[in-house]
Curated annotation (Swiss-Prot):
<feature type="transmembrane region" description="Helical">
    <location>
        <begin position="7"/>
        <end position="27"/>
    </location>
</feature>
<feature type="transmembrane region" description="Helical">
    <location>
        <begin position="187"/>
        <end position="207"/>
    </location>
</feature>
<keyword id="KW-1003">Cell membrane</keyword>
<keyword id="KW-0997">Cell inner membrane</keyword>
<dbReference type="GO" id="GO:0016655">
    <property type="term" value="F:oxidoreductase activity, acting on NAD(P)H, quinone or similar compound as acceptor"/>
</dbReference>
<feature type="transmembrane region" description="Helical">
    <location>
        <begin position="114"/>
        <end position="134"/>
    </location>
</feature>
<dbReference type="GO" id="GO:0048038">
    <property type="term" value="F:quinone binding"/>
</dbReference>
<keyword id="KW-1133">Transmembrane helix</keyword>
<keyword id="KW-0874">Quinone</keyword>
<dbReference type="InterPro" id="IPR018086">
    <property type="entry name" value="NADH_UbQ_OxRdtase_su1_CS"/>
</dbReference>
<dbReference type="Pfam" id="PF00146">
    <property type="entry name" value="NADHdh"/>
</dbReference>
<keyword id="KW-0812">Transmembrane</keyword>
<feature type="transmembrane region" description="Helical">
    <location>
        <begin position="310"/>
        <end position="330"/>
    </location>
</feature>
<keyword id="KW-1278">Translocase</keyword>
<dbReference type="GO" id="GO:0003954">
    <property type="term" value="F:NADH dehydrogenase activity"/>
</dbReference>
<keyword id="KW-0472">Membrane</keyword>
<dbReference type="InterPro" id="IPR001694">
    <property type="entry name" value="NADH_UbQ_OxRdtase_su1/FPO"/>
</dbReference>
Length: 331
């Protein structure tokens, strides 16, 4: 088969990897809705979903059937094109961002030299999805929720980026595999970049609009915020997109600060690399859910003040100290 060139084989393998990884991420995001409700019930000493199947295991299927048969309604007063585009961007941008995550030494969708910058670009696109949803709905609660969300996301993305610049300064690369290899050769970044880790996880919770930073969706004030007018599959895309964001941020925490696939016995059992990565990612997913179960929601002004007055100075100090140490080591 002369037409089957090495370049074509590479393209086919990349497409197959992309499909497998993206399907796995979507399935994980959907399953998280059931896992979260079960864990919240366990931690809050109540039942949670327990009617559909053993331990409510088929609750996800029931939810999907219900959502599929709900009317996919678009308000007559909405801007229909932008109204439809918003959930596609919200879910699609986070799915595409997962392409840079190296799952094992040999498995990953894309090995980009601008890996971290690519993540920042995709995370920035979610702001447009929120603004589009709020503005196109032609609803005052949706608009207020989208304004809150965009202001919060932009504020926290500032030090989301700065919190990783210490890692970039030490490694000298934006490539995710280079960062993992540096941790394998030296030490996991949770130790030298502890303050960067703390600020990144705070920013990750805020950017994904998770409790306690779910101000854009504050039910008591804004009646579910920017997706109040959404129903059916469009609302489902926002819903699953939020959980995909949790999986993405958890995978990045595992990769950037805990060595990614690195762990013991990889020389003799290389297949363990996938389980190390999955276990680390799963730990941070559980942490997201625990934060929701245990912390109250602050006021919106407190959320914004915490961003600019506490987290931003902390990331700047961490970056300055890291830069000074890197320069001192070079000399």
């Amino acid at each position: 088969m002369s037409w089957l060139t090495p370049a074509l084989v590479t393209i086919i393998l990349t497409v197959v990897k992309a499909i497998v990884v993206l399907l796995a991420v979507v399935i994980c995001g959907a399953l998280l809705s059931w896992v979260e409700r079960r864990l919240l019930g366990l931690w809050q000493d109540r039942y949670g979903p327990n009617r559909v199947g053993p331990f409510g295991a088929f609750q996800l299927g029931a939810d999907m059937i219900k959502m599929f048969f709900k009317e996919d309604w678009t308000p007559p007063f909405a801007d229909k094109m932008i109204f439809t585009l918003a959930p596609v961007i919200a879910m699609g941008a986070l799915l595409v961002a997962f392409a840079i995550v190296p799952i094992t030494p040999t498995w990953g969708v894309a090995d980009l030299n601008i890996g971290i910058l690519f993540f920042f670009a995709m995370a920035g696109l979610t702001v447009y999805a929120v603004l589009f949803a709020g503005w196109s709905s032609n609803n005052k609660f949706a608009l207020l929720g989208s304004l809150r969300a965009s202001a919060q996301t932009i504020s926290y993305e500032v030090f989301l980026a700065l919190s990783l610049m210490g890692i970039v300064a030490q490694v000298g690369s934006f490539n995710m595999r280079d960062i993992v290899q540096y941790q394998i050769d030296n030490v996991w970044f949770i130790i030298p970049q502890f303050f960067g880790f703390c600020t990144f996880i705070i920013a990750g919770v805020a950017v994904t609009h998770r409790h306690p930073f779910d101000q854009p969706e504050a039910e008591q004030e804004l009646a579910d915020g920017y997706h109040i007018e959404y129903a059916g599959m469009k609302w489902g895309m926002f819903f699953v997109g939020e959980y995909i964001g949790i999986v993405l941020v958890s995978a990045l925490l595992a990769t950037l600060f805990f060595g990614g696939w690195h762990g013991p016995f990889l020389d003799t059992l290389p297949w363990l690399s996938f389980f190390y990565f999955a276990a680390k990612t799963g730990f941070f997913i559980m942490l997201f859910i625990l934060i929701r179960a245990s912390l109250p929601r602050p006021r919106y002004d407190q959320v914004m003040a915490f961003s600019w007055k506490v987290c931003l100075p902390l990331t700047l100090i961490n970056l300055l100290v890291t830069g000074a140490l890197v320069l001192a080591a070079a000399q």
